[in-house]
Amino acid sequence: MKIHEYQAKALFRTFGVPVPDGGVAFSVEEAVDVARGLGGYPVVVKAQIHAGGRGKGGGVKLAASEEEARRFAGEILGMTLVTHQTGPQGREVKKLLVEAGQKIAKELYLSILVDRATAGIVIMASQEGGMDIETVAAKTPEKIIKVRVDPLTGIQGYYLRQVGFGLGLPKAALKEFSALLKNLYTLFVKNDCSLLEINPLILTSDDRVMALDAKVDIDSNALFRHKDLVELRDLDEEDPLEVEASKFNLNYINLDGNVGNIVNGAGLAMATMDIIKNAGAEPANFMDVGGGATAEMVENAFSIILRDKKVKAVLINIFGGILRCDVFAEGIVTAAKKSGITIPVVVRMEGTNVERGKEILAQSGLNLINAVNLKDAAEKVAAAI
């Protein structure tokens, strides 16, 4: 689960990570009021959306006066902000973060993330922080410091010193930086985060360190332990179809293609998307209904995919195990009759009660295209578009 920058900074404050003074605003007047309360200019007016690259997209402005703060707030609030992470459709800006400007001596990069390859935690840092960190990582990866932390032993003093020395911090800033990184690690672990990112982490002219930006991603599977964090979820920032799918415990991710697919099992779903691409088409989604899906869950999954206007055909790929083919077929028939099928639907089923499942589909009167195997299914759905 992603949260907004202003929410992430509130968490930072709770754990003793220094951030600029500021406040969230939902209107131009609120933004001006926050700016007035900061006691002087410049102030920074920042769009609040769940995407990076806001500065390059025009969503971050430095205001030198109240007049500029008002103007920038009016320009950013309500705009459709397009960044490399939003896609061409962009995101509407519905809230702002207004913060006190800082005297920046140096911009750095700092993050903590889960490294699934080593089943550990990695601290990443760089002296090249700021808007071009992606370019730095791609073209000069040697400038990225990586320190692996064993979660069983936790953060140790030598990890803190290794990162601090790697960032080239002056001696006067090392103690404060070590405290910041230690607190950040504590926040990461206690809140079941998958990513914490500060870009930029700044070194001020008086050798202080401060998080000028904040990104926090929380493991959605751990939210049952964090009822307070669940309240930070902003459904307006999420895909409406993904929100709908989550209500029915369906694993759904909306993509850019035009072939919808329904599969049971994450691995089989990814293989299905690969073979759709191999056949010359593009998957419109990832949809795993799970092994324990009921007919109702299947019905909801099919209805969600049919509501996606990009979808021009659907591929259903089911291997019946815990989810029997007859149960799946009943769900498909119910959903199709309720929604009305106006696009080609290719079905490939194997496994438990497959003959009964095929019988249910055949007797339904629906115009479904049967496939003998996965390759045949992909070729038929690609040809049907």
Curated annotation (Swiss-Prot):
Keywords: ATP-binding, Ligase, Magnesium, Metal-binding, Nucleotide-binding, Tricarboxylic acid cycle. Binds 1 Mg(2+) ion per subunit. It catalyses: succinate + ATP + CoA = succinyl-CoA + ADP + phosphate; GTP + succinate + CoA = succinyl-CoA + GDP + phosphate. GO terms for cellular component: cytosol; succinate-CoA ligase complex. ATP binds at K46, G53, R54, G55, E99, Q102, E107. Pathway: Carbohydrate metabolism; tricarboxylic acid cycle; succinate from succinyl-CoA (ligase route): step 1/1. GO terms for molecular function: ATP binding; magnesium ion binding; succinate-CoA ligase (ADP-forming) activity; succinate-CoA ligase (GDP-forming) activity. Residues 9-244 form the ATP-grasp domain. Mg(2+) binds at N199, D213. Its cofactor is Mg(2+). Heterotetramer of two alpha and two beta subunits. Belongs to the succinate/malate CoA ligase beta subunit family. This is Succinate--CoA ligase [ADP-forming] subunit beta. The lineage of its organism: Bacteria, Pseudomonadati, Thermodesulfobacteriota, Desulfobacteria, Desulfobacterales. The gene is sucC.
